[in-house]
Amino acid sequence: MPMLFGWLLLRIAHVPYAEIFTVDEALQISPVYLSVMSFVGGVTLSILATNIMLTIAPKMDIPNNINKVAWIESTMEFPKQIAWIFPFSSACIEELFFRGACFFAFTGVGINPYIAMIVVTIMFVFNQVYLVDNKVQAIVIGVGSMFLSILGCFVAGLTGTVIPSMIAHAIYAVFFIRSNDSFDAV
């Protein structure tokens, strides 16, 4: 459904679907480099935010709260070797919709890229947070999603393609799932 809605959104904005996969030829920096830097930036900012949260509220049990998020909990039921497939696929689809369809459709109809970034980030954070059960989950998932969306919009706007943000988001999701200690308990 998000793919169909994204395609329709791009059609309404008169942005060719294939265009969101085309790297701007005038780009002076490698999209691969930007993908890696977006991933590193997203992870670094998420870890920084988590450490600030733990400094403010040391008794906040972030790992157990995050492991109880429904999609993370269900991902942990798969063997570790294949558990990465679900977050990887979801991240790619989310990027196609939020940074690909929404961001490029908004900028395609003349909305200022920074306003488009703010709107897309609010939409993305809401999409992530409505799936959680408590405040700790909402704060941690919300803050990480905010950083990921801002970086993704920035890179998509800079490169003219959704591919670097898609790669960064997919690696980000897989990184956090693969580094989850809960697999050791299974």
Question: Model segments located where?
Answer:
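Hydrophobic H-region at the start of alpha-helical membrane spans
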Residues: 1, 37-41, 144
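Transmembrane helix-loop-helix hairpins at the membrane interface
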Residues: 75-186
